[in-house]
């Protein structure tokens, strides 16, 4: 279910690793003896141990992207602290048809990817991107991914940013 024809392969591989807790999060690096326990705090500065569950679902900074995305696409939240359950609930949250589930799958994969790349940006470049800019990145990349695989997708940035479901004919 993480494999999606409109999502770059590297993002699907990343999600596959994420859902199996195989990313090099600080908690995994501590477990493998790569870094000391003292170096395991979340890069956002929230004070919690950086695990995949924390980073993507509980961190006060990173997890906030999900609510911004839900507001953008216009549906209610997902209530779980387990990544695999979050993925399934997010994709099936509208109870809609295959097209809406495919779109939500693409958005979930993209959000996770944006969060991970931002985590790496904070960790290795000591740079913080404001959350509204991360949402803009989700909007921009999702439009680009859809246009790259579908030449007949003619909607522009303004239409997409305003109402993506209407652009896809599912809203």
PLM features per residue range, with description:
Residues 2, 32-85, 89:
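Short Cys/His-based metal-binding microdomains
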Residues 147, 151-171:
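C-terminal helix/juxtamembrane-tail motif
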Residues 130-143:
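Short secondary-structure subsegments characteristic of cysteine-rich extracellular domains
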Residues 45, 49, 119-127, 142:
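Residues that mediate protein self-association or partner binding, especially
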Residues 99-118, 162-165:
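Short flanking/linker segments adjacent to small metal-binding domains or redox-active Cys/His motifs
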Residues 1-5, 28, 91-102, 118-128:
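Short, solvent-exposed helix-loop connector elements
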Residues 1-49, 171:
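Helix/loop segments that flank and initiate small ligand/metal-binding modules
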């Amino acid at each position: 279910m993480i494999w999606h024809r409109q999502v770059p392969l590297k993002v699907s591989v990343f999600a596959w690793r994420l859902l199996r807790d195989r990313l090099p999060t600080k908690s995994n690096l501590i477990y493998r003896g790569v870094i000391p326990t003292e170096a395991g705090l979340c890069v956002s500065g929230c004070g919690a141990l950086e695990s995949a569950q924390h980073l993507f679902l509980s961190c006060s900074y990173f997890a906030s992207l999900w609510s911004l995305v839900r507001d953008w696409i216009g549906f209610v939240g997902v209530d779980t602290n387990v990544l695999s359950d979050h993925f399934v609930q997010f994709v099936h949250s509208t109870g809609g048809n295959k097209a809406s589930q495919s779109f939500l799958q693409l958005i979930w994969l993209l959000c996770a990817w944006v969060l991970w790349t931002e985590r790496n940006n904070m960790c290795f470049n000591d740079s913080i991107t404001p959350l509204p800019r991360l949402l803009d990145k989700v909007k921009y990349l999702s439009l680009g991914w859809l246009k790259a695989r579908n030449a007949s997708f003619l909607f522009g940035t303004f239409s997409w940013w305003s109402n993506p479901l209407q652009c896809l004919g599912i809203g």
